[in-house]
């Protein structure tokens, strides 16, 4: 969570004096639940990718498992944007200036980026002897979350210096997201910034050191667009009006998300193509809109589950995982892909790999509970729905 100093309220904060949901409000548990869902989908993707072998790797089961693996990164980025909006609104209520808010957000993003670089270093050291040195500079999801938070901090700083209405903040965040998506096909092809060293260009289009953009990396274009979409939605949800109409906004957003999916598919089927190179699965703005629609639909379903369904019943493993998502992301990689993998790689049936997945899930849940206890946030853990915007991953 972003941590901001407590100062006396400033005059320009009067329009934000209405309370923002507190970190203790169980209404926000759905955000952590959704982040926990991203963790579980990530676990299954990595476990089956690492451990399935033989005919199992050619099965439809494996294909759908890896298709599900396209969801966690957009989910994490989308939720990071919502988290930043929460903290910005709360900081405005406390009277923070645009500069203070911007600096704190940029600093938190820089911390996540530093952790991403440290993670790459750890992976390189553990894999010493067979990993290429260029892996140190790979643009992975942690790097992109950090960069995205920094960019959101810059944007909030700039906008708040001139306009402080929620509508302005949400509209500009959404416009930035659409601009990132619209520029992605060009920056991956005809507008590539080839003048930059590849470690820097890779943050723009994921070129790495391979000469062409790589779809398995997470460059700013288009991935940061999901964070700004989350930021836009967060500003609406955490506004005074949004809090009063929370259920209606989320559910209408889910319906709008489904409509957006169909609209984007219709748009993509038009014969006119405005980009010189068409790549639906990696840079198409239409595919970006489809995934945004899917995120909105998932958010609505998760909200309903946590407010009116079993997700609101006492202890939730997904909420727990969502509160420590950075930790379980970091640790599970070593037990799935690393030298201390709990199963032999590419050597198991679906049943064997599923047993390994269950082991990873339970182990990461236990680790999460231990971390929560040690941090003093779990008294008691069972029966408690602590929400929010705990970590940006």
Language-model segments: what does each one mean?
Residues 2-5, 12-393:
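Alpha-helical transmembrane segments and their immediate juxtamembrane cytosolic regions
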């Amino acid at each position: 969570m972003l941590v901001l100093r407590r100062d006396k309220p400033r005059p320009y904060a009067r329009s934000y004096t209405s309370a923002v949901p507190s970190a203790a409000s169980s209404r926000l548990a759905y955000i952590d639940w959704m982040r926990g869902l991203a963790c579980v989908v990530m676990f299954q993707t990595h476990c089956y990718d690492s451990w399935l072998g033989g005919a199992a790797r050619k099965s439809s089961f494996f294909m759908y498992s890896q298709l599900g693996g396209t969801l966690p990164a957009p989910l994490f980025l989308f939720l990071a944007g919502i988290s930043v909006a929460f903290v910005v609104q709360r900081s405005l209520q406390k009277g923070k200036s645009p500069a203070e808010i911007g600096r704190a957000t940029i600093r938190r993003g820089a911390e996540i980026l530093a952790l991403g670089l440290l993670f790459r270093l750890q992976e390189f050291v553990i894999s010493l002897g067979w990993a290429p040195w260029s892996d140190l500079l790979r643009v992975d999801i942690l790097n992109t979350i950090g960069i995205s938070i920094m960019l959101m901090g810059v944007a909030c700083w700039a906008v708040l210096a001139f306009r402080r209405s929620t509508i302005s903040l949400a509209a500009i965040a959404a416009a930035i997201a659409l601009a990132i998506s619209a520029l992605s096909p060009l920056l991956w092809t005809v507008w590539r910034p080839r003048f930059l060293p590849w470690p820097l260009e890779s943050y723009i289009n994921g070129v790495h050191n391979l000469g062409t953009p790589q779809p398995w990396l997470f460059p700013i274009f288009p991935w940061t667009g999901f964070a700004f979409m989350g930021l836009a939605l967060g500003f609406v949800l955490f506004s005074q009006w949004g809090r009063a109409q929370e259920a209606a906004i989320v559910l209408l957003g889910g319906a709008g998300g489904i409509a957006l999916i169909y609209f984007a598919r219709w748009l993509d089927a038009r014969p006119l193509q405005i980009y010189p190179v068409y790549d639906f699965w990696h840079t198409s703005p239409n595919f970006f809109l489809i995934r945004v629609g899917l995120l909105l639909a998932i958010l609505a379903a998760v909200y309903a589950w946590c407010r009116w369904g079993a997700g609101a019943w006492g202890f939730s493993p997904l909420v727990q995982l969502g509160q420590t998502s950075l930790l379980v992301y970091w640790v599970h990689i070593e037990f799935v892909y690393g030298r201390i993998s709990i199963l032999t790689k590419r050597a198991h049936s679906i049943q064997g790999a599923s047993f390994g997945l269950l082991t990873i899930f339970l182990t990461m849940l236990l680790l999460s509970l231990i971390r929560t206890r040690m941090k003093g946030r779990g008294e008691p853990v069972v029966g408690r729905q602590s929400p929010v915007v705990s970590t940006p991953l």
